[in-house]
Amino acid sequence: MENVIKYMFNGYEATVIRPENPNGKWIWKTEFLYAFDDAERELLSRGYTRVYYSISNKYGSYHAVRLMHDFYRHVIKEFELDDKCILFGFSRGGLYAFNFALFYPECVSKIYLDAPVLDMRTWPPEGSENREQVYKEYDLTPETIKTFKGHPVENFAEFFSHGIPLYLIAGDSDEIVPFEYNAGKMLDYCFDNGIRIKNYIKSRCKHHPHSLYDVKSIIEFVEE
């Protein structure tokens, strides 16, 4: 029987879902803990601990990454977890997963990105509350965001230099997080630079649904 543990850490809610027989390995989903989680539920049944730290509306900012690292150090000790996590970054959660791995690659064993936001110039949309939150969190303006070098798409070289195994899943008709400028741009970079990553591009698929109807390839990626 799984055990769901909720508590506050540094002012933000943490959720740790412990399997009946934990194996020390853990999935850290950076946003939307229970959304499209067939793969996570299967992995839980195989002994993986599921972890979520609710620091929403920080969009993977430098502040968010520092909070994540503090939480990481706490959670591996408190729950006797492996010192490398497996990051799952869905949509805006891709910002957190990418940036945490960028700054703390030694803390990450694998990354699964699903329809990730990799360029904040393309999402959130201008005029939205989310966009205003991005400006505040990153200390940006409508002008400075255009030349900001902290977008994940500006940091592919350093990110891929760490050699962290990556699985990228996205829909090629994403109407919310434009494929061409986000997941598509990552694929183009990998192709142009001879970098091999596991990927599954869903033809004529929009932003939703995330994940896959058959999550076998996700399970295999995590366990291989």
Q: Model regions: which residues?
A:
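Alpha/beta-hydrolase fold nucleophile elbow
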Residues: 79-91
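Short beta-strand element of the alpha/beta-hydrolase
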Residues: 23-32
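Alpha/beta-hydrolase active-site loop
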Residues: 59-80
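C-terminal catalytic histidine-bearing segment of alpha/beta-hydrolase fold enzymes
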Residues: 176, 180-224
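Hydrolase active-site cap/lid region
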Residues: 99-144
